[in-house]
Amino acid sequence: PICGTRRTHYKLLSEEPVFVEKPRISITGATRKKILELFDFRDAFTGASISSTPEIDHKEPWTRMEQDIDDSLLSPEEIKEHFQLLTREHNLLKDRACGKCKESNIRTPFLGIPFWYEGDSTYCGTCRGCGWYDGVKWREELSKHIK
């Protein structure tokens, strides 16, 4: 029977899922405390103390990583190399900016400022140089150019 209603239908292209799930490693309470103290509870983008719940952010976006990093096995220097602290709002801003970059391979200017301390606006296999990747390093490098 035909109902006369027009509807959009999606065609299943494959029985196997295309999305490959990457397991995330949970951060223990002790490791979280260690990381928060290491970064002095300061937001990487502003340097200000975080009064709300700080979020431990992977510098390299989750969508670009092959596998998660087990932070419980890292030295303090390695933790600083792979992670930064952000407020929830800043983490959401970063997530959106990195999502646009992932789609277009064009780096979104950090907080509207078109400055990259390594590379330029074109993503070339690394996030290094982008303010969204490392807010502290980005501010330090920009300050050198201003002085």
Regions picked out by a protein language model, each given a short descriptive name:
Residues 47-49, 91, 102, 128-131:
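Cys/His-coordinated zinc-binding microdomains
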Residues 1-31, 124-147:
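A boundary/linker detector
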